[in-house]
Amino acid sequence: MKKNRLNLNGVVVINKVKDISSNKVLQQLKYLFNAQKAGHTGTLDPMATGVLPICFGRATKIAQYLLDADKEYIATIRLGIETDSGDAEGEIIAKSINIPELSAEYLETVLAKFRGDVVQIPPMYSALKYNGQPLYKLAREGKTVEVKSRNIKIYELELLEFNIDSLKIRVKCSKGTYIRSLAIDIGKTLGCGGHLIALQRTQSGPFKLSEAFRLEQLKDLSFEQKIASITNIESVFIDKPIYSLLEEEKDDLYKRGLFADKPHLDGTVRIYDVEKFVAIAEFDKGKLINKKFFDQDILISE
């Protein structure tokens, strides 16, 4: 007889290994924890490794916050070879022997072009849709369509190491950034083409690689240890400011969903009732525009 699934609530930060899909990680973790409900917060390509937060239960309601959060990656780019997918899993479409002589100074001038506000064209091999069809499906059929560019922001772009035909970089960027596209664009700027050969996500929102678990680690844990690996919902917003409800505001918020304008509040705010986290609220110049209640931050609820 199938065991009753547990109503778990919180986030498990996974360190995804290479050659497994994000959805496979999700399904394995859901089975491992016998969880009723689970969802991930944006896919990592099978060849990519690193931070993949998985949400259980009520935490799935805030998955979008992690989708929208800034990310950090370590990426390795191979120069002189272009592929149709922009990474090592694609077919080679061009080769060049004209790789320039690389130096730290020269590469710095190239990387400087990609810091700050950047207009980027996503790769054809992506989950973005064109007339309802995922681009990767069209690409596999040999079809090419015009992909709309998007505005992204690269906050930090650091050269870690390089040799005659490759470079390793650290990238801190906004949502919607494709590191494969960045690799392609850097290769074009160098005049020799390039593609991504390794990618590790080292941070997603507040979650860092140092606090992530590999699936194999979790399989060896006791039930109590598995539960202890789940971080509470508030951890997603740990860098957000706190507003503590006044006694006279509680009925309006809880019973009527009303909240008086707060000119000093803007963006995402944690709402506290005494010392308890109860909600996440979105403010626009002091006006409440959205809210989500979390009546308890426990990891298991009946």
Swiss-Prot record:
Keywords: Isomerase, tRNA processing. The active site is at 45 (nucleophile). Responsible for synthesis of pseudouridine from uracil-55 in the psi GC loop of transfer RNAs. It is an enzyme of class 5 (isomerase). Belongs to the pseudouridine synthase TruB family. Type 1 subfamily. HAMAP family: TruB_bact (MF_01080). This is tRNA pseudouridine synthase B. One of its GO terms (molecular function) is tRNA pseudouridine(55) synthase activity. It catalyses: uridine(55) in tRNA = pseudouridine(55) in tRNA. Its EC number is 5.4.99.25. GO terms for biological process: mRNA pseudouridine synthesis; tRNA pseudouridine synthesis. It holds the Pfam family TruB_N. InterPro entries: PsdUridine_synth_cat_dom_sf, PsdUridine_synth_N, tRNA_psdUridine_synth_TruB, TruB_C. The gene is truB. PANTHER family: PSEUDOURIDYLATE SYNTHASE TRUB1 (PTHR13767:SF2), TRNA-PSEUDOURIDINE SYNTHASE (PTHR13767). Transmembrane segments: none annotated. The keyword Transmembrane does not apply. SUPFAM superfamilies: Pseudouridine synthase. It comes from Francisella tularensis subsp. tularensis (strain SCHU S4 / Schu 4). The keyword Cytoplasm does not apply.
